[in-house]
Amino acid sequence: MKYDEFYKLCEKVYEPITNFEKSCLPLCAAENEQSEFTKIPLKSFIQDKYIMGGIEEYQEHNNFIGSNNLFELYNLLNRLSSELFKSMYADGRTLTGVNTISLLLMSLFKNNDKILISDEECGGHSSMPKLCKRLGIKTCSMPYDYNNYDFDYEKLNTLLLDDSIKGILICQSDMIFQPKLEKIKMDKNKILIYD
């Protein structure tokens, strides 16, 4: 395929995305409308846009609004990479958010490892238990003190004495206060991921 054809296809795919951008303000669930982070999508065209599933076949069910436009762009990138580099697969998604956590979990833990996570009931990101399950990582909820809107560090530190616990994933989506990481006591063989 000639590269000017790719350029025309890119323009065709790009137009619905920019139209979508003009009519929507995509907010991250963990941010309020005044934060600088939520203004990034207004300044950039593709940064921090999400699409669930792979990029070879679009999964419409429960996917993000506007992700069908993004899928077309990733599909075009995949085709161009195949043409230029003879690659079988190219993933142009940015290494941010859930993509980063996925990579960290796959790199730092093994199948059947057990970790503590901040679950949905205490403001944790709702996709983390599902992601861990898909990667074969067992999860337990971090103890939470609902009266103080914070983790129960005494109970947490007791749990961390268990050698079968390989680490902690604190991935908050909705939170009132920053967790006090300095109160977590863990040995050097355990891993803490904080997003």
Segments predicted by a language model, with ranges:
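Short glycine/serine/threonine-rich phosphate/pyrophosphate-binding segments
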Residues: 98-103, 123-128, 176-180
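N-terminal "arm"/small-domain region of PLP-dependent enzymes with the aminotransferase-like
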Residues: 1-61
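Catalytic PLP-binding core of fold-type I/II PLP enzymes
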Residues: 177-195
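Conserved PLP-anchoring active-site segment centered on the Schiff-base-forming lysine
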Residues: 109-124
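Conserved N-terminal alpha-helix of the aminotransferase class I/II PLP-enzyme fold
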Residues: 46, 50-100, 107
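General beta-strand structural signal in soluble alpha/beta enzymes
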Residues: 89-94, 117-118, 169-170, 192-195
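Buried hydrophobic packing segments
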Residues: 38-41, 100-108
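PLP-dependent aminotransferase-class I/II
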Residues: 131-178
